[in-house]
Amino acid sequence: MPVLNLKSDLADADDLETLMAGIGRRARAAGRAMALAPAQTKDLGLRAIAEQIRASAPAILRENARDVSAAQAAGLTNAIIDRLTLDEGRVAAIAEAVEKVAGLADPVGRQLAAFERPNGLLIERISVPLGVVGVIFESRPNVTADAGALCLKAGNAAILRAGSDSHRTATAIAAAMSEGLARAGLPADAIQLVPTRDRAAVGLMLTGLGGCVDVIVPRGGRSLVERVQAEAKVPVFAHLDGICHVYVAEGADLGMARSLLLNSKMRRTGICGAAETLLVDAAVAETHLKPLVEALLESGCAVRGDAATQAADPRVSAATDADWRTEYLDAIISAKVVGGLDAAIAHIEANGSHHTDAIITDDTDAAARFLNEVDSAIVTHNASTQFADGGEFGFGAEIGIATGRMHARGPVGVEQLTTFKYRVHGSGQTRP
């Protein structure tokens, strides 16, 4: 597939290292100021950003038109071009999303725990910002504002590295954000967009820029996430795949199962929370398998199944071993009959990606076991896998979904963009 020109905008590697080091130092200083900013000031800054994005709409759309034209000339797919394209309505939605972040509760300064020791020490655990968040994303220019706003709300600075195809648009949005921050008396450098398309800049960000970057969040395809996870010298909040399962267990209502399966798979096939595998319990296969497969096929979804699923409908093609570990991101699903709850859990453990998995059943004991034993960031009972979203969780927005075990897991919203410190209050105690 043709790609956009990724040639460095800079003269040599030394220039790039100097540029990135300066961005890191300015972000660290801005992050310190943001960490100390009162909640009201941060919210004023976010509302000023939203106003400036609206005021800058003509400039943003002009730069977006240039990005879209270049993408079309490079032969990028219609799906990528659609993600890249903005219009007046989409720009307005970007501004509105920033305002919604301003309306969230401040995650900084909350008392997470408090206790008194036998020696009279009073100890508090208090939420504090992470510091500097590096966000590396591809073709969605709205990520500039979405991710930046979440970082700012949590008292962080952000270094944003846009994909080459959205670079001009992201630059225009980031400029509006910096201007809004300055109007509110906050450091404009709390939002910085890497001003080069050079992929070497990503490598420098992954080193942590000499201790100036505290965490990296990649937003993009598998190749980007694989590179970030392999090369990063700082913590990463990310997921590699969204291989999500819907398990129709014994005790499942057929009507509910049909509705939840179609929503989990077909509402939006290209998102990480879309179901990729259907598991049907052998105890209900005789009554549930055929109508569920027919519903998928009639909705335009191709089905790749095991022998039992192929026998249910001649339109089902044979599944290979690779299908059970494939994130299709398309109107395709693999389907299999399993011999009970233990077999379903074992299949998910062997083939899943620890993202989102669902059980459909009226058996509360079986549901409790599934929710307890399936080791995924999100597990649902009688609910669509496509609820794997920060907005649906009431987080207001998300910077991504994390499937790792350290710090953030599931939707990464403003609370997950904080860490904590301990405050210890004494009255002259010394340690014996």
From Swiss-Prot:
A GO biological-process term: L-proline biosynthetic process
A Gene Ontology term for the protein's cellular component: cytoplasm
Enzyme class: oxidoreductase
Keyword Manganese attributed: no
Location of the protein in the cell: Cytoplasm
Gene3D superfamilies recorded: Aldehyde Dehydrogenase, Chain A, domain 1, Aldehyde Dehydrogenase, Chain A, domain 2
Pathway in which this enzyme or protein is active: Amino-acid biosynthesis; L-proline biosynthesis; L-glutamate 5-semialdehyde from L-glutamate: step 2/2
UniProt keyword terms in alphabetical order: Amino-acid biosynthesis, Cytoplasm, NADP, Oxidoreductase, Proline biosynthesis
Reactions accelerated catalytically: L-glutamate 5-semialdehyde + phosphate + NADP(+) = L-glutamyl 5-phosphate + NADPH + H(+)
Enzyme Commission number(s) of this protein: 1.2.1.41
One GO MF term: glutamate-5-semialdehyde dehydrogenase activity
Protein family per UniProt: Belongs to the gamma-glutamyl phosphate reductase family.
HAMAP family, alphabetized: ProA
Known role: Catalyzes the NADPH-dependent reduction of L-glutamate 5-phosphate into L-glutamate 5-semialdehyde and phosphate. The product spontaneously undergoes cyclization to form 1-pyrroline-5-carboxylate.
NCBIfam families (alphabetical): PRK00197.1, proA
Protein name stated in the entry: Gamma-glutamyl phosphate reductase
Organism of this sequence: Methylorubrum extorquens (strain PA1)
Recorded name of the encoding gene: proA
